[in-house]
């Protein structure tokens, strides 16, 4: 792999080239094609996937809480993911990996029925109707998630936008997912504490007084 020297971009260190160089060089980061070429031991180790992970900090915190699981934070923007990647390296958290890829590529990146959990945290709601197909809870994506989850595996969603959250619940029910846990105000609920691990967006919305919706759903006979 070609080494990119972040110091070449030191004058513009707040810009994307500097952050992309850091992502490129991190041992726990993979471009889409690099992940596809990784050893089976690496690719098949993943048990929890976060789609649209942003900085990946949510996955880092969950990985710290669950050292026996292997987490993958996936996002199309490597300049964002590098933040979580370097935080994990600095803290010695080795059970979280970072993949730069689009959400619609996950079927190529992970084996069928290989994941215990799949997290979607504060995705773009794409409020315009003509953009509904881009929502990460659109039926097209839900069918992909179903193929990736193990029997009994869970899909979890957190969001502050009530309209998007309710629309997502409708899609889950329509696609015959079973709602196992649900709250329209996560941080005032009795749901597990790990669900309340904060993302950067979550901290922002809560500071503005917004309630966070959270749902866990399964397919088939999952619990």
Residue ranges of model-derived segments:
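Class I S-adenosyl-L-methionine
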Residues: 175-223
């Amino acid at each position: 792999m070609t080494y990119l020297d972040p110091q070449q971009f030191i004058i513009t260190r707040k810009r994307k080239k500097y952050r992309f160089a850091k992502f490129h060089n991190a041992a726990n980061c993979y471009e889409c094609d690099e992940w596809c070429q990784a050893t089976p031991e690496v690719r098949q180790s993943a048990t929890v996937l976060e789609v649209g992970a942003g900085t990946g900090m949510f996955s880092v915190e969950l990985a710290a809480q669950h050292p026996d699981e292997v987490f993958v934070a996936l996002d199309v923007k490597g300049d964002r993911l590098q933040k979580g990647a370097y935080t994990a390296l600095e803290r010695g958290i080795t059970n979280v990996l970072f993949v730069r890829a689009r959400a619609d590529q996950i079927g190529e990146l992970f084996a069928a029925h290989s994941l215990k959990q799949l997290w979607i945290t504060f995705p773009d709601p794409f409020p315009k109707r003509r953009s509904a197909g881009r929502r990460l809870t659109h039926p097209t994506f839900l069918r992909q998630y179903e193929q990736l989850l193990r029997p009994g595996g869970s899909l979890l969603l957190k969001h502050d936008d009530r309209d998007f959250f309710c629309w997502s619940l409708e899609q889950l029910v329509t696609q015959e997912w079973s709602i196992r846990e649900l709250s329209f105000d996560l941080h005032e609920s009795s749901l597990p504490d790990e669900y309340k691990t904060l993302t950067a967006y979550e901290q922002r919305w809560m500071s503005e007084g917004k309630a966070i919706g959270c749902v866990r759903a399964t397919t088939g006979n999952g619990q």
